[in-house]
UniProtKB/Swiss-Prot annotation:
Tissue/organ expression: Expressed by the venom gland.
Similarity annotation: Belongs to the neurotoxin 14 (magi-1) family. 03 (ICK-30-40) subfamily.
Sample GO molecular function, one term: toxin activity
Cystine pairings recorded for this chain: 75-88, 82-93, 87-108
Domain comment (free text): The presence of a 'disulfide through disulfide knot' structurally defines this protein as a knottin.
Pfam family, one: Toxin_22
GO cellular component: extracellular region
Propeptide segments, given as residue ranges: 21-74
Organism: Trittame loki (Brush-footed trapdoor spider)
Name under which the protein is recorded: U17-barytoxin-Tl1d
UniProt entry keywords in alphabetical sequence: Cleavage on pair of basic residues, Disulfide bond, Ion channel impairing toxin, Knottin, Secreted, Signal, Toxin
Amino acid sequence: MKTIIVFLSLLVLATKFGDANEGVNQEQMKEVIQNEFREDFLNEMAPMSLLQQLEAIESTLLEKEADRNSRQKRCLGENVPCGDFPCCGKLACEKTFGYGWWYKSPFCVKPSKG
């Protein structure tokens, strides 16, 4: 019974002094919050706002994406039908006897010497 009375008295004392500490903590928290709002207000007055920074980052990302998606047109290799697309390097688009009569289109071949 004596131990229960001791624990109850400790509980009452802890709750009483705990509330006093909470009041001090709440005052400190209010000061911290006010200081943070002051810093945020000063940050809003900065020459480059957060929105401008995000727009700058977005524009650079869009430029990189546009560069990545734009490819050079590919050329056609040897013995490939060449109707609308160009042939690579030293190849010429000519009608040949081998494939041309079957597919009825010119092919990329090495130009004949002569």
